[in-house]
Design a protein with these regions (language model features):
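Membrane-interface alpha helices of multi-pass inner-membrane proteins
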Residues: 164-179, 186-195
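Hydrophobic transmembrane alpha-helices
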Residues: 73, 95, 99-103, 149-158, ...
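Aromatic sugar-binding surface patches on proteins
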Residues: 548-568
Length: 605
């Protein structure tokens, strides 16, 4: 009875994390180019596709995932949707390969395998990793790195005499290494696993040669490395490096604890108790990993359990990945210590704990008291991780809306202070955006920028129809165009009449019963608007955040406003009366919403 209850609980937890993780990654995925990809675009517009692929960006070789990005530019106008789907598919691939090792294991029973399955799913689909998994470009890089590493773990067992498999493993190591800088951690991981699996010396030497070839190839890729940050990191002080390592490893625990306390992470991490928790938790995890690793290195008896291969591989690989992060960012960590706990590093540190739990589950299977201890700790860890997982549902959706608003400013050719949601360097946006506009890529693919300056009668062949458009809007801030001309930010509320089809209402009825939110006839906000002057000339466009009332009620508990929109007016003249029309479904609304001039007060919308 206890076994069945344990299996049921583990299966329910795994399903809950899997379903919610996938749903909220899809709904919260970043819709526009952001962060480092502005640098890649800037390089791409002045070089060939091959030069773009082999170039190192921020000391990362992105050779293999760059082909995903180049394909998106070539065939999908730079849309983020293909990258989001590829990243999610690679995330599934990583989890599937690890689960293959779990269920191929012959040393554990069904109950422990189900618990291990729960651990793998939570480790991969925990929304604490949303800083990577909700950004298609980053997810495709990092998940390809992990998927290649997981493939190595699957193939490495019992292949010491199969040279074809050895070559495939080395090839997967190259894919991991040249997908993301942290992927170079695969080589010490492979060497250690090969030793513990009692590989013959020719196979170990072959992996060692692959390691040297990968390092030399990396050094030869442009731009050539001149600062040798690994050596600089080694000279920065052992105690400092160990402290950074402990904090990075413990960051999932710290984020989960902050979610339970209800305090924001940037405030919680500054508390002395939190700093102590980070150091000691990381130290305990590393000591446990070290004890397990030393035991396996001495005994060289790893080949009996594929589950332990997966766990030990994850532990060693992600410790190596974190050490590479420290080596590359050591100077930045000195200047800004809080950067050590940046959420993007949770992608790696969470998998360290996943691997540690997998090893513990395998080792506890045949211990008298260890079995139930491991089960209780695994279930407790999953419950402990849930609040952060839950809170990130809302955080990543809010981030998506902020990115869409910043992209609206770029479409209108306006310089606003929300540009940092796209890039920390606004000047880079100013350099790259004209090229994106010229090639109709990314946020310019829909052609909204072409409407500005046209007469409204020339849009959609002059088609208009009653939409029952209602709302209000006002000028919230005066800004500037990219050419220095005056501009204005417009924020508002707008709705049009919309009836939910009966078939759709029937289909979602079971979900609405669960969440307690009835879907009724009501209004929706159009996705696009035009802002016109008295002569009928379009002076700017506006967009709403892509969140329907149904999705908001069912998946976000109605917490987000679904009627807001944001836009800009180019060449703004406060003496002119502007109006807003909806421009959804290739038709303009007959109704208009007047723009109120209230730049001195921010509207509460």
């Amino acid at each position: 009875m206890a076994k069945r209850a344990t299996q049921a609980c583990a299966a329910i937890f795994a399903l809950a994390f899997l379903v919610t993780g996938v749903v909220y990654v899809l709904f919260g995925s970043c819709p526009a180019t952001n962060a480092d990809f502005w640098s890649i675009y800037e390089f791409y517009f002045s070089h060939s596709w091959w030069q773009t692929a082999v170039q190192k960006y921020a000391d990362h070789s992105l050779f293999f995932p760059n082909f995903f990005w180049l394909a998106s530019v070539k065939f999908f106008h730079g849309s983020q949707v293909p990258l989001n789907l590829i990243g999610l598919a690679l995330l599934f691939t990583t989890a599937a390969l690890l689960l293959l090792l779990v269920w191929r294991d012959e040393t554990t029973g069904r109950t422990m395998k189900i618990v291990a399955t729960m651990v793998v799913i939570v480790g991969n689909f925990w929304m604490g990793r949303e800083a990577i998994t909700c950004f298609g470009g980053f997810n495709s890089e990092n998940s390809l790195t992990m998927a290649a590493a997981a493939l190595c773990f699957v193939l490495i067992r019992g292949t010491s005499r199969l040279w074809l498999m050895i070559l495939i493993i080395i090839g997967a190591g190259f894919v991991s290494s040249f997908s993301c800088g942290q992927g170079f951690a695969i080589w010490p991981t492979l060497l250690l696993l090969a030793w513990c699996l009692r590989f013959r010396w020719p196979a170990i030497v072959a992996i060692g040669v692959g390691t040297l070839v990968a390092i030399i190839t990396y050094q030869l890729l442009p731009p050539l490395s001149e600062d040798y940050r690994v050596i600089q990191a080694a000279n920065s002080g052992g105690i400092t490096l160990v402290a950074h390592l402990c904090r990075l490893i413990s960051s999932p625990v710290l984020y989960a604890a902050a979610a339970w306390t209800g305090i924001r992470m940037n405030e919680y991490s500054s508390v002395n108790q939190a700093s102590t928790l980070a150091l000691w938790t990381g130290a305990v995890g590393l000591v446990l990993a070290g004890v397990i690793l030393i035991r396996r290195v001495v005994r060289r008896d790893l080949g009996k359990s594929s589950l332990e291969i997966a766990g030990l591989g994850l532990v060693v690989f992600n410790v190596g990945a974190v050490m590479l992060i420290i080596a590359g960012r050591i100077q930045y960590f000195h200047m800004l210590p809080s950067e050590v706990l940046a959420p993007r590093y949770l992608f790696w540190s969470s998998l360290f704990w996943t691997g540690l739990f997998l090893v513990a589950i395998q080792r506890a299977e045949h211990q008298r008291w260890g079995r139930w201890t491991a089960i209780v700790f695994a279930l407790a860890a999953v419950i402990f991780a849930w609040p952060e997982h839950y809170l990130m549902w809302f955080h990543n959706k809010l981030s998506k809306c902020r990115v869409e608003q910043a992209a609206t400013a770029v479409i209108n050719g306006v310089v606003d202070d929300n540009s940092w949601f796209l890039s920390l360097d606004p000047r880079q946006i100013g350099r790259v955006a004209p090229q994106l506009r010229a090639h109709r890529l990314d946020m310019f693919a829909d052609g909204l920028q072409d409407w500005i300056g046209l007469n409204e009668t020339s849009l959609f062949r002059g088609r208009r129809k009653p939409e029952d458009l209602r709302g209000k809007c006002r000028v919230s801030k005066l800004v500037e165009c990219d050419n220095g001309a005056p501009a204005a930010r417009v924020v508002g509320l707008a709705t049009t009449r919309h009836h939910v089809p009966r078939v759709v209402r029937w289909a979602i009825a079971p979900v609405t019963w669960i969440v307690g939110k009835e879907i009724k006839k009501g209004y929706v906000t159009p996705a696009r608007f035009v802002i016109v002057d008295p002569t009928g000339v379009v002076r700017g466009v506006a967009r709403s955040c892509s969140l329907t009332p149904i999705v908001n009620r069912v998946f976000y508990q109605g917490r987000f406003p679904t009627t807001d929109f944001l836009g800009y007016i180019r060449d703004y003249n406060p003496q002119v009366q502007y109006v807003v029309r909806s421009a959804a479904d290739d038709v303009l609304s007959e109704e208009t919403i007047p723009v109120q001039d209230d730049a001195s007060n921010n509207p509460q919308l």
